Amino acid sequence: MVKYAGKCQCGAVGYEAKSEPSFVIHCECLDCKKSSGAGHATWAAFETAAVQFSGVMSRHSTIADRGGTTTREFCPTCGGRMALSYSSLSGHVLVAAGTLDDPDSIIPSLVLYNKRHTVWDHVAASLATYPAMPPRTYSEWAKSRLDEACVFASGNDTL
């Protein structure tokens, strides 16, 4: 059963997800700012096996600040960004939340890379923030409970 669906602006690329997201984040890293053209990007992470994409996407890869590969996928027709994957977050794909048919169906719980916050961009003050990535690998972080990751907002640097 499909729980979430979305598509790019022109409709050439779409997806369906058959599970709840593992986590939903706002990211204020420089890569997300550059690729979104905004102060942050919002991502819903799903297990790769739960998401089915349709249409052909173009890809652009960069090296992340921890040395892994970040691959962004987008529609070659309208340029709409669709998905993001990290080499160190195997088994997950992050879907651009703005592409969801019902973007209000998800709620971000955490802001990453808050040390790079842009003063004119506003996210809910109630969200937990972390200055960069938690000091675990992406894979370990994704497997941990999100509320454990939120302890970083209180200044505790260990999980």
Segments (PLM) and residue ranges:
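A short Gly-Trp-Pro
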Residues: 1-7, 12-159
